[in-house]
Amino acid sequence: MNSPGNTPGAARDLHAALVYALDTGEPLVNETFAEGNVQRRVTGSYAPFEMPIHDARVRAAADPAAFSLDQNGFTLMPHATQVADFFDPLQLRDIYYPEVIALVKQVSGASRVVVFDHTLRSGNEQQRQQQLLREPVFTVHNDYTEWSGPQRVRELLPDEAEALLQRRFAIIQVWRAVAQPIIANPLALADARSLASDDLIISERRYPDRIGQTYRMRHNPAHRWYYYPQMQRHEALVFKVYDSLTDGRARFTPHTSFADPDTPAGAPPRQSIEVRTLAFF
């Protein structure tokens, strides 16, 4: 429920159930299959934990330096797009990918950015089936691990990988609404400073053509969670899921969709897109 005294312009903090992995010793495996890799099988044990989730939008409005990519692992940026239809692959390739490259360079200071994939998600099952979209993910996770971050560079840029891996690189994702504001199932992100190294549990990610790794998370009451209420189409959430530097800056940013208990009845299903990039410095 909302914190007492929430009014327009006040922080819309809330409590919601976030689904964490249970460290039972059972291997965590997430396997995708079928056309478009939209079906999945999952092994392992998970459980919901009630967590406070803080309104980052109001805090950032009061202090523009409150959130940054290197301090917290994420930041929200104003980002108008020329894309008319996010479900048109040509518009994504020819318009949106270059927009994302410019944005990631701006936010991170990277000298080179490579877009390597995107995922469209919908909370509407019929739309997912018709357009081969994926569902929102309701388990706390980080998309890359100490091993799978560098491995992704080797897979995508094999001729350059060993030279590129001699210097700093990061994997940075850009997430946004594709149509109406996000009302149902928004995205929550954990402040990277609130993580402990033993919170991270390796999960094997199996695709038809390769095997990767992600991190699932053990519950830790010290985790500090944030979200941006009602994200608009002209905003982009930029967050870091891997950084090769180990100097104290944010390296991993666990995140998850969640059910906002105050979502109004009849709220439109969420539609979102995330783009994944390699950023070299």
PLM regions and their residue ranges:
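Catalytic core of Fe(II)/2-oxoglutarate
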Residues: Q213-F281
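Non-heme Fe(II) oxygenase catalytic core, chiefly the N-lobe of the double-stranded beta-helix
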Residues: N2, N6-P229, G266
